[in-house]
Amino acid sequence: MYINMDIKYRDRNEIIAQILESANGNPVRLTKIMYEVYLSHGLTKEYVRLLIEKGLMEYLDGERTFKTTDKGMNFLRIHNKVQELTT
């Protein structure tokens, strides 16, 4: 039996950062986020709902898309800086 030791497990902050990054710039649909971040539909919805509640993402109702807010961009900057300092 072969076990792939290259698999990197992501913590919650890493998943959040990847979601915010995928919705950075142009508004995107939930499916695009799901495929870019490699999450199930249910988990993607849970994370996106949390990010909207915390003000890190916004839902554009007329377009049915999501976009990273300024607060979300600030989270990304801080997260990336911490990653840079710890690796």
PLM region descriptions:
Residues 19-23:
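Short helix-to-turn junction characteristic of helix-turn-helix DNA-binding domains
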Residues 1-17, 43:
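Short alpha-helical segments that sit at the start of domains
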Residues 27-37:
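Short acidic, hydrophobic short linear motifs in intrinsically disordered regions
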Residues 52-62:
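A short, conserved structural fragment
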Residues 64-77:
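Basic, amphipathic "hinge/linker" alpha-helix immediately C-terminal to the N-terminal HTH DNA-binding motif
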Residues 1-4, 81-87:
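Amphipathic alpha-helical dimerization/coiled-coil segments
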Residues 38-53:
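Short amphipathic alpha-helical interaction segments
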